[in-house]
């Protein structure tokens, strides 16, 4: 199934939490930090403000950091995604 977000919305897929700390300690269950890093899988066309089209700054494939309490979680074809507004994306990770 393909998903196409509307307006200035973006579909992201969370990246997996780290299994191990830098010092080599294996993390299990609730000890893993919830990731706020994700990969962009779909991007809306942008929005129109006062008759001016606002282009999207992110593109498919970008790795991004997003606000902790934003977006809507959805499940499609057994995969979990989040749909959020571009304004809830804090940075692009290069």
UniProtKB/Swiss-Prot annotation:
Database matches in InterPro entries: Chaperonin_GroES, Chaperonin_GroES_sf, Chaprnonin_Cpn10_CS, GroES-like_sf
Record Pfam families: Cpn10
Residue intervals passing through the bilayer: none
GO (cellular component) term, any one: cytoplasm
Keywords, comma-separated and alphabetical: Chaperone, Cytoplasm
Gene Ontology biological process terms, A to Z: chaperone cofactor-dependent protein refolding
Cell compartment(s), UniProt: Cytoplasm
SMART domains xrefs: Cpn10
PROSITE patterns listed in its UniProt record: CHAPERONINS_CPN10
A GO term for molecular function: metal ion binding
Superkingdom: Bacteria
Recorded family membership: Belongs to the GroES chaperonin family.
Job of this protein: Together with the chaperonin GroEL, plays an essential role in assisting protein folding. The GroEL-GroES system forms a nano-cage that allows encapsulation of the non-native substrate proteins and provides a physical environment optimized to promote and accelerate protein folding. GroES binds to the apical surface of the GroEL ring, thereby capping the opening of the GroEL channel.
Assembly behavior: Heptamer of 7 subunits arranged in a ring. Interacts with the chaperonin GroEL.
The name this protein goes by in its record: Co-chaperonin GroES
Organism listed in the record: Clostridium botulinum (strain Eklund 17B / Type B)
């Amino acid at each position: 199934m393909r998903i196409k977000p509307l307006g200035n919305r973006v579909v992201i897929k969370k990246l997996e939490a780290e299994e191990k700390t830098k010092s080599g300690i294996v993390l299990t269950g609730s000890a893993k930090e919830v990731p706020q890093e994700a990969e962009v899988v779909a991007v809306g066309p942008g929005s129109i403000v006062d008759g001016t089209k606002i282009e999207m700054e992110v593109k498919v494939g970008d790795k991004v950091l997003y606000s902790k309490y934003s977006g809507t979680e959805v499940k499609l074809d057994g995969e979990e995604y989040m749909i959020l507004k571009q304004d809830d994306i804090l940075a692009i990770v290069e």
